[in-house]
Each structure stands twice: as structure tokens, then as C-alpha cells.
Amino acid sequence: MNVFRPAWLSAMLLAIFASPATLADDHMLNGMEVSQPFNVQANLCKLNPGVTLDDYHAMVEDYFDWAEKYDVEPVFVRQFPLFSHQNMQRPWPYDFVEFLASEYEPWGKSWDLWLTTEDGMALNERWQSLAVCHVKQAHGQVLYADTEALENDDERYVSWNWCTAKVGFEQLSQKHAEYVAQISENPSGLIGWALMFPHTGAADAPGDFAHLAIYPDLESFMAR
């Protein structure tokens, strides 16, 4: 499940080799242009001992105010594992993962401000006192989106499928285009489809890129 701010994003993610997005109305989601690649930051977080999610989210709310002050607001999503790969031998090391999506240059500006302004550095210190978060960067692009369905609620279910390409750019792009055409004709409960391609800090990623499928509920997920 996800906690959204402003309202949508889990599928934010990628592909330098992706076909253009197919959106129900236009190319904007929550005021962000998503028909072209954009940056996605992933924060893989474990709360420090004694810290609650409410404690942590109070800091995040202050971050939203800070980002608005400097005009560097991202689209924000928090994901919690529901059906994970963890077991006794391979426990999941994080409590949640956050995704912050933005155009590239504004996101670079936000990091400069985060590391150099007095209030940014204070928030950074507070953040690190609450949780250990491993920060990664990725390219993102939405391939298919039912904008109305994505924006009418703040909780979604997202499946991840990590992949390693066995074909070249043209073949992969063609397959994506074919699948987008099929989804557009018959979504079968799917309300969003996107890709993520890590570009910084993810040398140990489980694949070269990930497909993300977004559903409004678990009934839709199981139906596919």
C-alpha cells in the first residue's frame, strides 16, 4: 500500500528505452509532465529504535513545507510491503520505501538547497536521527495511465517485476508499445504501467530495470 502526496505516483518509473506514455486525458499527473523521462529518488528506510511512523511522518510534513517554500516540491509516494519475497533466511531489511519524483534540474536544485540552506541542513539532521535511509536515483517514465482512476484516491497497490533485457533497444521498445496498445484496449483493472531504470546508487539492483503495474484494489490485481 502507498501513502501519496500530492496523490499519485507509485509507478513513477522509467525507461530510457520506453515507448511514449498513453494517458487518458493529457500528459500531466498531479501537475507533473510524465510523457517524458523524469527523475525518481528512492529512499529505502528503516526506522531507528523507538521511532514511530507518526514521528517520522511529522518530519516528512515539515519537509513538504520546506519544499514548497523553495518551489522544489516532488510527487511523493510511500510503499509498504504486502506480498514480499522475505522469509526466515531472507528478511526484508526496510520498514518502507519512499519515492520522490521530479524533473531532473529541479531535483538537483532541491538537493543543493537541502545540503546548503540552514533549514535544509536542519531537516536533514532530523531525518537521519529518525531513520536509516539508503538513497538511490532512477529514471522514470509512465507508459500507461488512467489519470482519473489514479488521482481519485491516495492508496494503490503496485506490483514490481525486475527485468534484464535479452534483446536490443528497438525490440524492447516495440514490445512495450504492443503491450501499451493491449492495455489501452482492455485494461482489465490495470490503471497504470511504468518503468524504472536505476542510474545512481543501485549497482546491486535485482535487474536492469523494473516494470511497475498499478491497481486500485487487490481484486483487480488478482483478476490479472
PLM region descriptions:
Residues 4-5, 17, 23:
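Generic extreme N-terminus detector
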